[in-house]
């Protein structure tokens, strides 16, 4: 099974997000900030987003911290925050991201 990101269950988002990661120095917590510029659901006029669902062979990671970004009164982007409160959650998230990158031909770089 490949990894997918969905805003509406059953509908994979095709736009690849910009993902920024932050992590506490002691590894006890972290945050992933996803930014989707002009995602499919905006292009299709579907703005009733209830959450972001990260799906892979291990199951599903979910966040409800999702918001639309507007330019000149029109939806332009979606930003979602996924918080990790333990090293185990961080490790699980990184496994998802590795699968997502692999299934979409992407790479990972530290900045």
UniProtKB/Swiss-Prot annotation:
**Name the UniProt record assigns to this protein:** Photosystem II reaction center Psb28 protein
Q: Which GO terms describe its cellular component?
A: photosystem II oxygen evolving complex; plasma membrane-derived thylakoid membrane
Instruction: Supply the gene name.
Output: psb28
Q: Family per UniProt? A: Belongs to the Psb28 family.
Does the keyword Thylakoid belong to this entry? yes
Give the UniProt subcellular location, in the record's own words.
Answer: Cellular thylakoid membrane
Please give the subunit comment from the record.
Part of the photosystem II complex.
Q: Which organism is it from?
A: Acaryochloris marina (strain MBIC 11017)
Entries under InterPro entries matching the protein = Psb28_c1_sf, PSII_Psb28_class-1
Which N-terminal residues, if any, form the signal peptide? Answer: none
């Amino acid at each position: 099974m490949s990894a997918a990101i969905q805003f509406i269950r059953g509908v994979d988002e095709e736009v690849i997000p910009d993902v920024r990661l932050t992590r506490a120095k002691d590894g006890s917590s972290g945050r992933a900030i996803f930014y989707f510029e002009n995602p499919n659901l905006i292009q299709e006029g579907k703005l009733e987003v209830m959450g972001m669902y990260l799906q892979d062979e291990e199951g599903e990671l979910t966040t409800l911290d999702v918001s639309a970004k507007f330019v000149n009164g029109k939806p332009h982007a979606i930003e979602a925050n996924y918080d990790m409160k333990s090293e185990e959650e961080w490790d699980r998230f990184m496994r998802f991201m590795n699968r997502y990158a692999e299934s979409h031909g992407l790479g990972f770089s530290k900045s």
